[in-house]
Each structure stands twice: as C-alpha cells, then as structure tokens.
Amino acid sequence: MHTIEQIFINGEFVTPHGTEWFDLYNPATAQVMGQVRLADEVDAERAIAAAKAAFPAWSRTTKQERIAALKRMHAAVAARHDDLLEAVIEEYGAPASRSAWMASYPAEVIAQAIEALEVFEFVTPAGAATVQMTPLGVAGLITPWNSDAGFI
C-alpha cells in the first residue's frame, strides 16, 4: 500500500498542515491501494507565499535560463517514465497502450513548452507600438487530477 504524506512547497517536500486523508483505489480491483494526506488552506497559503517570494528573481531570468530550467525538468520527468507508467497502470487501470501514452505525456508537454519558448518573442512590434511581455505575478491553478500535465 502506498502512503503519500508529503507535498512540495518552496523547493522541498514538507508534511502538510492538513490532516485529512484520501483513499486511492485501484479501479481494476476496487481495492484501496494507498492513501494521500491532503493539503489544506494553510498549505495553499504557504505555497502562494513561496511563489511570491520566488517571483522577483524568476521574473528576471532570461529566456535561455528558462529554457535550461525546463530542460532540467524534462530530463527529471523523462527519467521517471517507468515509475509514471507503473502508477498510471495501477491508479487508472487503463489498457497498456493508453497507459504508455499517459506516462509519456508529461515529458511531452514540457518538451512542447520548450519548443514554444524557443521561438517566443517577448518584444514584438505592433504597428507603431511595441508590445513587451513582462511577468505580472503569481497565478494559482487547480487542475483536474486526471490530466495535470495537460492543464498546466
């Protein structure tokens, strides 16, 4: 049985403030295969505060630095493909062909983000004006559990 009792905030795994547990079911067997300790509002506030603290430095990074960060992220996710595949098979109960695609998808999304960033222009002419894309702030997202990588 898997027990997930930490979340990632401010560059480290931490125990959530939240105390509620959520059962994970194997859809093929309907058996509980694990539990996840859920985050709560305090954890969300901690994550938002960490993101706000990181924002000034991150917003000053160059396009090449951002591409390098995405490439490191891609390598880390791609290196865990087999672990992702195992989790997809167990947690979704999807056929092998669908599971293989689902396990590859997060790395593919990051690769697509890298490709988009490589050709993205942060300063573009617009008639007599110039449009400059500048970071504005932190955004919070709540994504569906069944396709996190596809919605970020």
Can you annotate each of these PLM segments?
Residues 120-152:
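Conserved small-residue-rich beta-alpha loop and adjacent elements
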Residues 1-127:
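N-terminal Rossmann-like NAD(P)+-binding subdomain of aldehyde/semialdehyde dehydrogenases
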